[in-house]
Amino acid sequence: MIYPVNFEEVVGFDSIRKAIMGRCRYSGTQVKLFHWGFSNQFTEVVYRLDALDEVRNLQDRMPSLLQLAGADYTDFTPILNIENAFWEEEIWVVVVDVLQTYKKLSKGVSGRREEFPILASKVVELDAVDQVLLKVNKIIDEFGKVSVKASPAYAKLSQDIHRLEQETRQVVRGVFKELKTLGYTAETDVSVREERLVIPILAEHKRKVQGFVKDVSATGKILYIEPAQALELNNRLKELYAELRRERERILRALTAEVAPFESYLLSAMDALCDVDAWIAMCAWCLSHGAERPKISDEPRISLLNAVHPLLAAELQLRKSKAIPLTMQLDAARVMVVSGPNAGGKSVVLKTALLLQYMVQCGLYITALPESRMGIFHQLAIDCGDGQSIEQGLSTFSAHLKGLKEILDNAGPRSLVGLDEIGAGTDPRFGAPIAQAVLEQLLSKQSRVIATTHFSQLREWGAGISDVLQASMAYDVHALKPLYQLVW
């Protein structure tokens, strides 16, 4: 369970998700990352982190293997199942780029399965990919067009068109030269309108030129006229162009039908590269924020060494400042009560811990020393005491109580709970006992809890309990300003 529904927004993970999505190449990767989330399975979390390790290692040693090309062609694959439908040349170019990327990666890691087992397992359809590439490369040339060698008929039509175009051009240029000498033409050259060579004639001389008007300029001062001398040649060219288009479509239709049986392999290859694309984006984001892989164990614990909130650290860096790292541990002690002045950094401590735990269970490195130890939790919950809801007719404190009840109803030994200013928003005579009762309930459920407070009663209560760790935010009593350091 993740609580509340806007948990990611509260701790800042929504911004991290958007930043990672912005680094992706393929649209399918962005869809995957939109649905990407927290896992409470130890083996799955380790798998995700191992995948990042492999990408990081490969990026350091053979970065060219991770240079992705092409675009996501998944939305075009239904065409493969429609009779007489076909992929246009631009789609084939994209498919070739993607499959070449897949092939390059497959060849690069297949011989190093011990080093890159996850990546190698993602690119195993090499035989099918090779077959598709062979078929496509026979038809589509290096310029992304149907090759003149695609069929004997296509080759002959291309040759006939080339020969007739040259002949027609000579005739039209000859007429153009004569008319230019007479001063009938505009300053532009021979051009093409409706697949026919035409001459730009000044409007005042149009009746002096034998031919057919094919177009008029926006100002009406120039008419584009097909000279009568080229009419028969242009007509024949138009027929050849139509025949070439029909033959081109026949070739593309045949190629599409030939590749259609490989649809599942094409989808599998695209899906695999989307996974790799996601790992590349995640790894790049992590490294750009100085994140490292922590030690992972399948138990509900959290031990952070020199941890910072990545978004706060990035923001402060822009201001030429630095975030104050925090070190904290919830292992033998299950509850940490953090006290300190307003604006002293208590909420940042709470959100940093919850965010980093969420990040690692999403498969990301964390902004803390690699010696940090992170466990696996089944529930993550945070209540910041600012849940006023006009729609539900709830005051801030009522919403706070509602949130606490939701957390208590679902808490257990595998829960990590963050409670910011627990019990605040009402008379301290009532707020402090409520806060104490909630913490006692969470203790009895063996949950891990980080609670910030101003109540001295909570500090006194926790002082005599071995499972409760007392912490505070350091304050410079001489300068009268907070130091943003967690002390425990």
Feature roles, as predicted:
Residues 1-153, 157, 262-265, 269-283:
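Conserved amphipathic alpha-helical "coupling/scaffold" segments
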Residues 16, 20, 31-34, 195, ...:
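Gly/Lys-enriched N-terminal cap/neck module of very large, oligomeric protein machines
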Residues 31, 84-87, 108-115, 174-188, ...:
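Active-site phosphate-binding and catalytic loops of NTP-dependent enzymes
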Residues 45, 49-52, 59, 73, ...:
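Amphipathic alpha-helical coiled-coil segments
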Residues 156-205, 301:
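Extended, Lys/Arg-enriched charged tracts that mediate electrostatic binding to polyanionic substrates
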Residues 222-223, 228:
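Divalent-cation-assisted or electrostatically stabilized phosphate/pyrophosphate-binding catalytic cores
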Residues 272, 278-313:
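Charged, amphipathic alpha-helical linker segments immediately N-terminal to NTP-binding catalytic cores
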Residues 297-488:
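ATPase nucleotide-binding head domains, primarily ABC-like/P-loop NTPase cores
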